[in-house]
Amino acid sequence: MAAKIFCLLMLLGLSASAATATIFPQCSQAPIASLLPPYLSPAVSSVCENPILQPYRIQQAIAAGILPLSPLFLQQSSALLQQLPLVHLLAQNIRAQQLQQLVLANLAAYSQQQQFLPFNQLAALNSASYLQQQQLPFSQLPAAYPQQFLPFNQLAALNSPAYLQQQQLLPFSQLAGVSPATFLTQPQLLPFYQHAAPNAGTLLQLQQLLPFNQLALTNLAAFYQQPIIGGALF
């Protein structure tokens, strides 16, 4: 009887321990291997044997794959940095050679433009005409180049003497530019006596006698017949 009770207690204890026991499954290598990158070395797959060491081993494997490449990368970058000034210098030399070839190809035209263009645009177009213009006296310049030196009046380009006469008479009347003879007969220059234009001597006499007597303006003969008393005219 006692033996039966002891066996019953043993069975109850085993059942209780089986109910509270924890199952530890074996590590599966297939899912972990599928998560690893394909470019890692074959030694990385061996770290999956122990799940506790897996992150540490993976980190070591990645570092071992990158570190051998870093010196090569540093050497290439330093070489590129050293070559950049050489590239700039080469580009500057090529540009200078191109400019030199362009200047040598058009040396005559370049020298003419540099000498004459800042002073006159005519030198860039026709150097011979520019030299002739520089050698001409100042009095002959309007006749040789009327459009350049007399742009304010078109008459000077056609007839220089007529233009000079017009410039002398123009401040008094615009009619002088058309007909100088008609301009002299106008009352603008003879406001005191209308008939004095044909005779300048009579005009001067009238200008002298005008402040004393108005009779000289109408009848010169009657004015001379007037008696002179005390130096005054009546």
Curated annotation (Swiss-Prot):
The UniProt keywords, alphabetically, are: Repeat, Seed storage protein, Signal, Storage protein
Q: Which residues form the signal peptide?
A: 1-21
Name which cysteines form disulfide bonds: none
InterPro entries per the UniProt record, alphabetical:
Zein, Zein-alpha
Q: Does the keyword Repeat apply?
A: yes
Report if keyword Repeat is assigned: yes
Pfam families noted in UniProt: Zein
Picking any one GO molecular function of the record gives: nutrient reservoir activity
Out of the domains of life, which is the source?
Answer: Eukaryota
Chain ranges passing through the membrane: none
Q: Which family does it belong to?
A: Belongs to the zein family.
Q: What else is known?
A: The alpha zeins of 19 kDa and 22 kDa account for 70% of the total zein fraction. They are encoded by a large multigene family.
Function (record text): Zeins are major seed storage proteins.
PANTHER family in the cross-refs: ZEIN-ALPHA PMS2 (PTHR48214:SF1)
Record protein name field: Zein-alpha A30
Q: Which organism is it from?
A: Zea mays
